[in-house]
Amino acid sequence: MSFLDRVKIYVKAGKGGDGCLSFRREKFIEFGGPNGGNGGKGGDVYIKTERNLTTLLELAYNPHIEAKNGEKGGTYNKTGVGADDLTIYVPCGTIVKKDGEIIADLTEEGQSVLVAKGGRGGRGNQSFKTHSNTAPRISEIGQPGEEITLYLELKVLADLGLVGFPNAGKSTFLSRVSAARPKIADYPFTTLNPNLGIAMHKKVSFVIADIPGIIEGASEGKGLGHQFLKHIERTRVLLHLVDPMGFKDIDAVESVKVIEKELKTFDRELAKKPRIIALNKADLPEAKEVYNKIVKKYKKHKVFLISAATGEGVDKVLNEIVKVISATPVPNVAISKSTVAVHGVEPLFKIVPLEDGRVQVFGRKIEDMVNMTHFNQLQGVERLRNIFKKIGLEKALIKKGVMPGDIIVVGQKEFEWSGTELDSERAEQPDFEGYKRRTTQAERLEKRRQRRLKKEEK
C-alpha cells in the first residue's frame, strides 16, 4: 500500500428530518388536536484512530464524506428515525486541522473526536401546542448538518526510528527484523516514504519506522527534509545506521555528526532522544577499522557492528533496543499554544454589507432559524418575525443604515427590507417572500359585509 501523510477532506453531517404538520381526525373526536411528530436527528461525523492503519491514502481517493439524514416525523406524534453516526478511521498519530488550527491530536488507539454535528430534527406542530394556541399550524424543517473542510496530517508513531544517510541499509534492517517488505535496491533514495514494521524480540513487541534517508541540509527543507524529519518526532528511540563507505564526500565517522546536527537543528528535542549507533555492512573489509573509530569518537553512545544482510550482530543490537525502549517513556508531544484554536463566545449575529449592495446577516443560530422555517406557513413566518424583533436584529439593521428596498441575506434566504424608523424607534418587519399579513377582525367583518351586499344586488 502506498504511503500518504497529508490529505484534505470535505465533511458534511446529516440533515435533521422535517417535522410533521398534522391533526388527529377521528370519528366522534371533535377536537383531536395536533399530532405531528418531530424529525429524526442527522448523523454526526467522528474521526477515530485504528492501529492497523498506516496511511491516509484511502481518504485521498474518497475526500467527500457525508453522513445520512434523519427521517421525517410522522402523524400520531411519531418521531422520525435518527441517522447513524459516521466514523472516519485514521492511523494513530493523525493531527486534525481546520483553517490552520489544530482541533485534535489523535495519538492513542481508539481516540475519537466529533468534527461535524448532525442537524436536529425539525419540530412537528404537536411541539408548538400551548394554552393560547391549541391548534398550531406550524412545523420546522430539519436543521442542516455542519459542513467543514479538514486537513489531516500523519506523524508516524513508532517505538524505534531508523535514521541515517541514504543507502545505509535501513530498509534491509527493517526487513531482517520484521515481516515488512520495503523496496530494497543498491542505489540511494530507494525509500521515499516511511515504512512501518512490527518486530518481536525476547517476547517484547515494538513498532519500527524506516525513515527515508536524511541528507545534509534536511533541517532546512533540503531533499524533502521537513517531511521526513517530522516523522521522527514521535519515536521513542533512534537507531542510527551508518554505512562504512560514507555518503558522497562525507566519510562514515563524520556522517554521525552530520545527522546529529540535522536532528538538533530541526528540533532540539530530537537530539535528546536515546540513540543507538549501528555500523552496517560488517562484511566489508574496512568495516572493523571504521567501527573502532566511531567507538572512540562517540563514547556516549552504544555502538554496534552489524550486517543487516547476513544477520551478523543483529541480535546484540536488538537486545540493546529492547532494553532502551523498556526504559524510555512514550513521548508526550505538546501542541504549541499558538496553534491551538481558542474559541470565544460567538455573537448571535453579525451584519456585513456586501459589494453588490445587499446586506448579509451571519450567525449560526439565526441562520438555522431561517433555514428551518417553512415560508408557506403563516404562523411560522410570524414566529420568525417575532424572533427577529426580540433579538434586536431590526434595530441593528437600522443602525447599519439599511434602507427600504435593500436586500437582506440570511442563510439561504433573501428578504426585501421595507422598514422605516418610526417615532417609537421601531421599524416595520422585513417583507418575507410569499408572506401575507394576517387580517384584523374589523377587516374580516368588512369583507363579510361586502359579500352580503353583492348577494343582495344579485
Swiss-Prot record:
An annotated GO BP:
ribosome biogenesis
**EC number annotated for this UniProt entry:** 3.6.5.-
Which residues lie within the region annotated Disordered?
420-458
Q: Which residues bind GTP?
A: 164-171, 189-193, 210-213, 280-283, 307-309
**Which stretches does UniProt call biased (Basic residues)?**
447-458
**Residue span, OBG-type G domain:** 158-326
Binding of Mg(2+): at which residues?
A: S171, T191
**Compositional bias of kind Basic and acidic residues:** 423-446
Q: How is this protein annotated for GO cellular component? A: cytoplasm
Localization per Swiss-Prot or TrEMBL: Cytoplasm
A molecular function GO annotation: magnesium ion binding
Q: What is the main EC category here?
A: hydrolase
Q: Which CDD domains does the entry mention?
A: Obg
Q: Give the Obg domain ranges.
A: 1-157
The protein's required cofactor(s) are namely: Mg(2+)
Q: What does this protein do?
A: An essential GTPase which binds GTP, GDP and possibly (p)ppGpp with moderate affinity, with high nucleotide exchange rates and a fairly low GTP hydrolysis rate. Plays a role in control of the cell cycle, stress response, ribosome biogenesis and in those bacteria that undergo differentiation, in morphogenesis control.
| Name of the molecule in the record | GTPase Obg
Query: What gene makes this protein?
Result: obg
